[in-house]
């Protein structure tokens, strides 16, 4: 949901209102962060599986909003997005997009590490380990939970901006429930408590889905003469 908010808000600001891409890199994550802040209110008393269902439900709301505001978003038909422009240079090639994203991934990891080592990060970890113990230690649960949603929205919105402008086209199909499941798998594979683990988990899943699965799919299709699409889904699921 936050990824979609960042992507669409940046695309609309840059291409329809003439906002510079560099400024949208600041404004769009803030908008996504505010959406995270809003969803944090009903989620304050929810934990575990129900919290996950709540955030997924919010994703459906965002999708309906995108379709409803078709004057700006073009609804489910999708939206063409301009290439990113920084310092007067338009970034178009795949390699340039790669280095742009890589640069901001490094920045995100550094910022994430700084947050994790700060007072805010220690409060997050205390709440994760035990809400009762954290509250007994004087940590304001509501405050830090809301802050966690805001920061999550910031990071996801930032990623949405990069996704939109390096993909050149976005639609509601890009932000379905499967994408959320992919993100969860990436974090679980790498380790939910480690920033570097999340990065490694992402690399593993991306390589698995785009390199190893197609290779195995072709071999199994040749051996057993089954449908290639079914094989790819089966291999990735395993």
Mark where each language-model region is:
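Transmembrane alpha-helices and adjacent helix-loop boundaries
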Residues: 1-238
């Amino acid at each position: 949901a936050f990824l979609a908010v960042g992507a669409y808000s940046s695309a609309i600001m840059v291409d329809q209102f003439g906002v510079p891409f560099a400024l949208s890199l600041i404004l769009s994550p803030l908008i996504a962060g505010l959406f995270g802040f809003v969803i944090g209110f009903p989620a304050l008393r929810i934990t575990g599986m129900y919290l996950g269902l709540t955030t997924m439900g919010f994703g459906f709301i965002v999708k309906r909003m995108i379709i409803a505001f078709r004057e700006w978003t073009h609804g489910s038909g999708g939206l063409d997005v301009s290439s990113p422009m920084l310092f007067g240079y338009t970034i178009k090639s795949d390699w340039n997009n790669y280095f742009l994203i890589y640069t901001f991934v490094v920045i995100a990891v550094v910022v994430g590490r700084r947050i994790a080592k700060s007072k805010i990060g220690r409060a997050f970890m205390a709440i994760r380990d035990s809400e009762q113990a954290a509250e007994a230690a004087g940590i304001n649960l509501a405050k830090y939970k809301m802050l966690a949603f805001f920061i999550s929205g910031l990071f996801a919105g930032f990623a949405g901006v990069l996704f939109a402008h390096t993909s050149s086209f976005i639609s509601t199909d890009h932000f379905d429930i499967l994408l959320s499941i992919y993100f969860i798998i990436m974090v679980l594979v790498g380790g939910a408590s480690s920033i570097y683990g999340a990065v490694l988990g992402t690399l593993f899943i991306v390589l698995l889905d785009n390199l190893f699965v197609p290779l195995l799919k072709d071999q199994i299709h040749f051996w057993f003469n089954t449908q290639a699409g079914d094989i790819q889904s089966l291999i990735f699921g395993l």
